[in-house]
Amino acid sequence: RICYNHQSTTRATTKSCEENSCYKKYWRDHRGTIIERGCGCPKVKPGVGIHCCQSDKCNY
């Protein structure tokens, strides 16, 4: 699976992953909305939104 693995403020980068899914999680803090992308589908804390998907580059 090919997933994006960058944060909201950095240039888009991709990674070839062993997992079959990609994730995009997002939350708000003093900097605004933060978006983090990567491989797999991690558990998140309350207040953090997450979107998991199972196709290449699906987590943009």
Curated annotation (Swiss-Prot):
Subcellular location: Secreted
Pfam family name, one: Toxin_cobra-type
Gene3D superfamilies assigned to the protein according to its UniProt record, in alphabetical order: CD59 (2.10.60.10)
Lineage: Eukaryota, Metazoa, Chordata, Craniata, Vertebrata
Recorded superkingdom: Eukaryota
Record-level Gene Ontology MF annotations: acetylcholine receptor inhibitor activity; ion channel regulator activity; toxin activity
Tissue occurrence: Expressed by the venom gland.
InterPro entries xref list: Snake_3FTx, Snake_toxin-like_sf, Snake_toxin_con_site, Toxin_cobra-type
Disulfide-bond pairs as recorded: 3-22, 17-39, 41-52, 53-58
Gene Ontology annotations for the cellular component aspect, listed alphabetically: extracellular region
Function per UniProt: Binds to muscle nicotinic acetylcholine receptor (nAChR) and inhibit acetylcholine from binding to the receptor, thereby impairing neuromuscular transmission.
Similarity-based family: Belongs to the three-finger toxin family. Short-chain subfamily. Type I alpha-neurotoxin sub-subfamily.
UniProtKB keywords: Acetylcholine receptor inhibiting toxin, Disulfide bond, Ion channel impairing toxin, Neurotoxin, Postsynaptic neurotoxin, Secreted, Toxin
Name of the featured protein: Short neurotoxin 1
PROSITE patterns the UniProt entry points to: SNAKE_TOXIN
